[in-house]
Each structure stands twice: as C-alpha cells, then as structure tokens.
C-alpha cells in the first residue's frame, strides 16, 4: 500500500515537473521568430525586452519630434502595462456608464458620428463644439491608430477608447493641436487618467519657444493640474450620448475648467509683435 502511494506521488510529481518544464519551454520559445498567437486582430505580443526597447526608442523619438503621433501612440501602449491601463479599466468597471461603454464597445469615427448632423446642431451643444473644433483644426476622427501592443483584449479597447475620445477633450477645453496646446492637454489628461505617456509628454515643453514656455508654466500647467485633479474620470463619459447637450452644462457636470483661449493669446502676441516691428520701421 505504501509502495503504491509512493508510486502515485512520484507520478504526480513527474507530471507537475513536465508542466513546469513545458511552461518554461514556452517562455523560452517566445522570441522575435516565434510569437504566441495574437489575442485580438492587430495585436503584436512583445517580450519584456522588446517592450522596454520600444518604449525608450519611441519616447526619445517623440521628444525630438512631438508631432509624431505614431511614436506617441507606441509610448502610450508600451508604458501603460502592467498597472496603469488596468487602473483605468477598473475605474470603468466601478462606474455604471463605464461598464456600459465596456459592454457596448462604441467606436468614434466619421462613420459612427454624422459630422454634417453635428454641424447643424445649436452652437451651444457638445456635438457642434466638437465638429467645429475638428473643422477649425483640420483633423478627422479617423486618424487614431489601432492599439497593437497591449496584451489584454479588454484593456486594449480601453486604450483605444481613450485615444478616440482625445479630440472631445480638445473640444471641451478649447485647446488647439499646436504643440503648446497638445502638451497642455496631455498634462490635464495625466492628472485625470494617470496614463504614463501623458505625463511624459510634459517633457516636450523643453522644446517650446521661450514665450511659449512661460505661458505653459504660468498658465496652462497650473490649469492642467487643478482641472485634471478636480474633474471626473473622463474615460467614463459616453460622448455619443452627450452630443445634443449644452457644452457648458457638461463642463460644469464634469467639473472641467476651461483654460484661457490659447489661439486668442497666440494671435494677440503675433499682432503685438507685428505692431512693434512696424513702429520700428516707421521710426
């Protein structure tokens, strides 16, 4: 009897050892030439070394050229795991609207939103504000790239949702897509979402012109910290259901403070410089 128990125990031990060896073998086989199957369409699994290298390279590249949206997107994905994107997903799961968004999986594109209809809405609505902001900045909701480097399929959708809602954040704050405006909005987003890429983007402020730096540090960074911390979790806003609402009412509900109009500020500075230059020429 004792011998039989010993044999069975050894058999169980051997099976456990085989499973452990198989798991280690799979881990060793995960390489550039032998990747696991993707978890969703477009998914590219990465090893920890690949993820780190891609994060560093993309961060440096986006710092040198803040207009490289593809690099910024890559930094966002490679630095969001393992903690930050799960925190954002959990914030959605803890909110009734957030849970509906995760269940419905809406997408924000020119096919899902009728821009001509939004342009026809009253001027005080969220939809009109969003559509006219797109027109003024010359951008489209179709420019957001698909998530590739986040392994969890649900978390990948959360990142995609954040990415596609970004222009709504621009619209309700009024910030333009010039580098100065993007950095200000990223600082606001970091305080609201804690996505590392949004915080890292603030370092791009070192490349601003002196007068732009002064504005950022004195006006827009304090605004971003104050408003980003005070506002509700924006990832839980079902923007598609807010299009006909009064934009000021929504700002108040979300506790979003609108910053000074950056385009007006830049325009006035240009006019002052032009007037000063003309005065010098006349004298």
Swiss-Prot record:
Positions that bind Zn(2+): 166-167, 170, 182
Pathway: Cofactor biosynthesis; ubiquinone biosynthesis
Protein topology in the membrane: Peripheral membrane protein
Pfam families linked to this entry: Coq4
Cofactor requirement: Zn(2+)
Known function: Lyase that catalyzes the C1-decarboxylation of 4-hydroxy-3-methoxy-5-(all-trans-polyprenyl)benzoic acid into 2-methoxy-6-(all-trans-polyprenyl)phenol during ubiquinone biosynthesis.
Assembly, per entry: Component of a multi-subunit COQ enzyme complex, composed of at least COQ3, COQ4, COQ5, COQ6, COQ7 and COQ9.
Name of this protein: Ubiquinone biosynthesis protein COQ4, mitochondrial
Organism of origin: Coccidioides immitis (strain RS)
Upper classification of the organism: Eukaryota, Fungi, Dikarya, Ascomycota, Pezizomycotina
